[in-house]
């Protein structure tokens, strides 16, 4: 029988892909990759880009185009069969990656190309590919003795298994807890939209009443609006103890051992490669230059934000006491009373804004921003094969009418879909072996409430910001003009610069001129009224220091954990978290909180010793946007400068150079502090 993963040439045939196709396709693609590498090196006395790198890129691209839909479906349509198929491929992909990274012949060929006269005639993207490649050989243990190389391979394989297991445990633990409520009085204070969603969730399971889950669209409204403190506490405890040794499902899907083993292996592999800590190894491929620089950056920001964070908490305490007679605030009370305080101060709530952000208006408004700033047009394409009937497909064209890229949009939360929001690549822009241009394709994935009854999906303003964020990643991937796959789009971009375009695009969600067409009441079409807009903008920096301190807590926890790990003492996960909280947290912490056990970013998502990247890139994005504030948020010339210098360049040059070209100077932290309402 033919295998659709091996025969498709354009977009992935999602509806035809079955779990049994996965492993044979990946094995065949890897076999072809190995054969190609051996073939191009045989008798090749003068290795060149054309004779070595281009032919290998061709087969590598095929492997990633086969693996991408499999990996994506494992995240958005997870099933036991697909999960098994996906996991059966992780060891062989890891083995292949190590084999390439430790291939002496290939390493020598790269060195020969770098040393050749022809190197100077290669494009910047080609040169960067070779330079990055040589660095990656070193980081794959090319210089290690054979026994250590073998150990490196074993560790790499095990680490990819552990990351996948961690992720599965979080997904299973999230789906493994629900709360069935039959008495609507227990849900007093909850918005209509959340009640309707909980009712629909119960109906789908054949239950009366309401079903609450730990998915964010279900969990957050309870924490924010539900008057029932006992219910808030119950959900909070279930949520912060997912995949751990505590809470209602204690010991089920427990990630404790996985975390311990990951930290041990990360440390071992780093020492093997000559680094003191995993943090040092992590920075070898990033913009930041040293662990001291990162910790200095985080601690400096914490020092600026903490006094204001303490004031914000004190104001919340006073408010809860004066207005509600509450003298002790528990962690499951914070979101609830914060929302009440926000309403009291600004007379605005997320729920009042929701009717003004129906899906069709937000999506078309997003496309209008891309058009006004970058001159891009977005058109929906019908009839594209997808993994779920609610998924849509779009093409992006530039002002000349040239197709620049395409993307799948998967907006709604559902069972068997990983939580959160992300962008991933389906395929990359490159010139293929036949000399034809392959246009880039992205997946944009969110977890918003779906339409209920005859109402369209209505988004909170936070969700609008999330959609813009992921689209920012998307345009970085899709608008690239680089034609070498390994540095095209988001490829080859250091992790601490990759959030620049995503956080940058969020800014338009706060601009009156943009909100005029991003918003429109789902019944009347009326844009967000000026009075509401002013309240929303006034509330923008409500508890902003508390938010930044939470991000600093994540960033410092991650970086400290990987900087101070000592194999003699083992993982000090909870102790590290407690120490960091003492330094930066302004809210009390509970001994049984197991936030670390579902921190997928650093244990399953590539942000290990790198979570600081969000705040690092926030400095870049706020400063980049400040040029638009000076020159006009829809100034096409400024937009094209960002397009030409940042988005189109992908990973073909160092991000600091690209930033300076756009901004005319190095980044400054002032704009971030100003945007966050924090005194410099």
Q: Which residue ranges define each predicted feature?
A:
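Membrane-entry segments of alpha-helical transmembrane domains in multi-pass membrane proteins
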Residues: 14-26, 48-53, 251-255, 294-301, ...
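Short pre-active-site segment immediately N-terminal to the catalytic Zn-binding motif
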Residues: 449-468
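His/Asp/Glu-rich acidic catalytic environments and adjacent acidic regulatory segments
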Residues: 1-28, 33, 75, 82-289, ...
């Amino acid at each position: 029988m033919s295998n659709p993963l091996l025969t498709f040439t354009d977009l992935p045939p999602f509806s035809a892909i079955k779990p049994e196709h996965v492993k044979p396709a990946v094995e065949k693609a890897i076999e072809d990759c190995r054969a190609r590498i051996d073939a191009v090196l045989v008798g090749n006395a003068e290795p060149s880009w054309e004779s070595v790198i281009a032919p290998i890129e061709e087969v590598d691209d095929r492997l990633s185009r086969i693996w991408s839909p499999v990996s994506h479906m494992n995240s958005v349509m997870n099933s036991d069969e697909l999960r098994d198929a996906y996991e059966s491929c992780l060891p062989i992909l890891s083995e292949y990656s190590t084999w390439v990274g430790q291939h002496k012949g290939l390493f020598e060929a790269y060195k020969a190309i770098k040393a050749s006269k022809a190197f100077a005639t290669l494009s910047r993207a080609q040169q960067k590919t070779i330079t990055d490649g040589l660095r990656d050989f070193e980081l794959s243990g090319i210089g290690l003795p054979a026994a250590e190389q073998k150990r490196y391979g074993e560790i790499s394989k095990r680490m990819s298994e552990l990351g996948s297991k961690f992720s599965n445990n979080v997904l299973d633990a999230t789906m493994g807890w629900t709360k069935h409520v039959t008495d609507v009085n227990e849900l007093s204070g909850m918005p209509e939209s959340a009640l309707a969603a909980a009712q629909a969730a119960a109906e789908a399971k054949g239950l009366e009443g309401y079903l609450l889950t730990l998915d964010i669209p279900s969990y957050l409204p309870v924490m924010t609006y539900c008057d029932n403190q006992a219910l808030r506490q119950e959900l909070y405890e279930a949520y912060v103890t997912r995949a751990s040794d505590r809470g209602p499902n204690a010991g089920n899907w427990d990630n404790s051992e996985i975390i311990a083993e990951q930290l041990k292996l990360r440390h071992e592999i780093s020492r093997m490669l000559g680094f003191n800590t995993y943090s040092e190894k992590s920075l070898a491929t990033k913009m930041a230059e040293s662990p001291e620089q990162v910790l200095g950056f985080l601690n400096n920001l914490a020092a600026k934000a903490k006094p204001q964070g303490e004031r914000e908490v004190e104001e919340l305490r006073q408010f809860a006491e004066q207005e509600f007679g509450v003298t002790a605030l528990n962690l499951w009370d914070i979101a609830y009373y914060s929302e009440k305080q926000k309403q009291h101060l600004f007379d605005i709530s997320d729920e009042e804004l929701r009717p003004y952000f129906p899906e069709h208006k937000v999506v078309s408004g997003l496309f209008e921003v891309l058009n006004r700033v970058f001159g891009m047009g977005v058109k929906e394409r019908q009839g594209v094969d997808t993994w779920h009937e609610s998924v849509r497909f779009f093409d992006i064209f530039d002002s000349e009418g040239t197709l620049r890229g395409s993307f799948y949009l998967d907006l709604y939360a559902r069972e068997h879909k990983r939580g959160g929001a992300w962008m991933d690549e389906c395929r990359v822009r490159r010139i293929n072996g036949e000399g034809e241009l392959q246009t880039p394709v992205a997946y944009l994935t969110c977890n918003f409430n779906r339409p209920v009854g005859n109402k369209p999906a209505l988004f909170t303003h936070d969700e609008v910001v999330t959609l813009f964020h992921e689209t920012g990643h998307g345009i970085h991937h899709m608008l690239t003009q680089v034609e070498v796959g390994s540095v095209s789009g988001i490829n080859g971009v250091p992790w601490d610069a990759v959030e620049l375009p995503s956080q940058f695009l969020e800014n338009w969600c706060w601009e009156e001129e943009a909100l005029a067409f991003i918003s429109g009441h789902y019944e009347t079409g009326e844009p967000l009224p000026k009075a509401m807009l002013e309240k929303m903008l006034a509330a923008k920096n409500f508890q902003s220091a508390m938010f930044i301190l939470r991000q600093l807590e994540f960033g410092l926890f991650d970086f400290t954990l990987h900087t101070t790990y000592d194999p003699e003492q083992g993982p000090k996960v909870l102790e590290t978290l407690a120490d960091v909280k003492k330094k930066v947290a302004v809210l009390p912490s509970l001994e049984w909180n197991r936030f670390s056990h579902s921190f997928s970013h650093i244990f399953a998502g590539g942000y290990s010793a790198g979570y600081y990247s969000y705040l690092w890139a926030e400095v870049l994005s706020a400063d980049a946007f400040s040029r638009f504030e000076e020159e006009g948020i829809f100034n096409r010339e400024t937009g094209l400068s960002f397009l030409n210098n940042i988005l189109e360049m992908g990973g073909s040059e160092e991000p600091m150079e690209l930033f300076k070209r756009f901004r005319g100077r190095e980044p400054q932290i002032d704009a971030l502090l100003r945007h966050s309402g924090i005194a410099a």
